[in-house]
């Protein structure tokens, strides 16, 4: 109540403005608001107009860009392609025209003269080789060379390897010589396998395996087998060759010869009754044990006999 009395008291009511002044103030306020709104709307209209002009300019720029690109395409792609097509068509028409002229020329002269066949013709009247003399490539078909991509890639690899070989060794060689050298290297890298039942004994190994003559050996081999083992690879027949194929061939030859001689000795022993043959056992374990132990005994006897043979040869040379 105290607050209301302060604002609405008789003294305060006298200080209030009159009605005319209030209406004037309201009118001025409305004018100010209208001016502010007009300014805002004017700015919005200006911005909208500028945006419209910008978008129109952008559309025109894009259209112009498309026109320029189309012009460049027509100048660089379409016109040259069309010109080539026209040249091809014109050349084809010219070829057809020349063919037609030649055919008319042939018909005219055949109508004037008699029938032409074989080698009987008059070159003054009609020459069937007229076009070949005029154009040496007339009637010939040119086939482009076949290019295999795998073959080309292999040639490139060979050339690279040859260049590396020349750079490392400093020797110049042709591609054929380089391939021959590569083949020789591959053959040299191959391991020297023996394709016979017994391994070949070198000159140094019999010394290690050699035993004195009076020593006793516990082996179950017959005398015929010992003779075969002694005759296998005699030192005076073995030749050290650098060719792998030659050594393999010699080993096969010696092994086949030894097998034939062993069969002959066995047949002779059976005929004379000297060979002691035990009947084959039906037990699986005994047969497997005999098969496993047999090549070991034969190898030991082979090394021993070869060592004795080498010692005898050395004594004979002395």
From Swiss-Prot:
InterPro entries: FAM228. Disulfide bonds: none annotated. Belongs to the FAM228 family. Residues 259-297 are annotated as: Disordered. This is Protein FAM228A.
């Amino acid at each position: 109540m105290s607050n209301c009395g302060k604002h609405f008291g008789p003294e305060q009511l006298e200080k209030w403005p009159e009605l005319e002044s209030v209406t004037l103030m309201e009118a001025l306020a409305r004018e100010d608001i209208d001016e502010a709104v007009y300014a805002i709307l004017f700015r919005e209209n200006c911005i909208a107009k500028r945006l419209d002009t910008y978008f129109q300019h952008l559309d025109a720029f894009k259209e112009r860009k498309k026109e320029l690109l189309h012009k460049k395409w027509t100048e660089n792609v379409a016109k040259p392609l069309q010109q080539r097509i026209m040249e091809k068509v014109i050349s084809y028409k010219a070829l057809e025209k020349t063919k037609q002229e030649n055919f008319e020329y042939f018909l005219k002269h055949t109508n004037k003269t008699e029938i032409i066949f074989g080698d009987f013709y008059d070159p003054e009247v009609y020459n069937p080789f007229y076009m070949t003399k005029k154009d040496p490539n007339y009637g010939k078909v040119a086939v482009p060379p076949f290019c295999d991509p795998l073959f080309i890639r292999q040639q490139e690899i060979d050339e690279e390897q040859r260049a590396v070989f020349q750079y490392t060794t400093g020797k110049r060689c042709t591609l054929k010589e380089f391939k021959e050298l590569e083949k020789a290297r591959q053959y040299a890298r191959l391991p020297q396998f023996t394709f016979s039942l017994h391994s070949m004994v070198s000159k140094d190994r019999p010394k290690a395996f050699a035993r004195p003559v009076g020593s006793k050996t516990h082996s179950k081999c017959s005398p015929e087998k010992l003779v075969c083992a002694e005759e296998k690879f005699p030192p005076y027949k073995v030749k050290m060759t650098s060719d792998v194929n030659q050594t393999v061939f010699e080993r096969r030859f010696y092994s086949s010869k030894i097998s034939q001689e062993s069969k002959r000795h066995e047949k002779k022993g059976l005929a004379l009754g000297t060979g002691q043959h035990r009947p084959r056992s039906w037990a699986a374990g005994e047969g497997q044990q005999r098969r496993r132990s047999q090549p070991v005994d034969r190898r030991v006897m082979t090394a021993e006999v070869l060592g004795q043979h080498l010692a005898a040869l050395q004594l004979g040379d002395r």
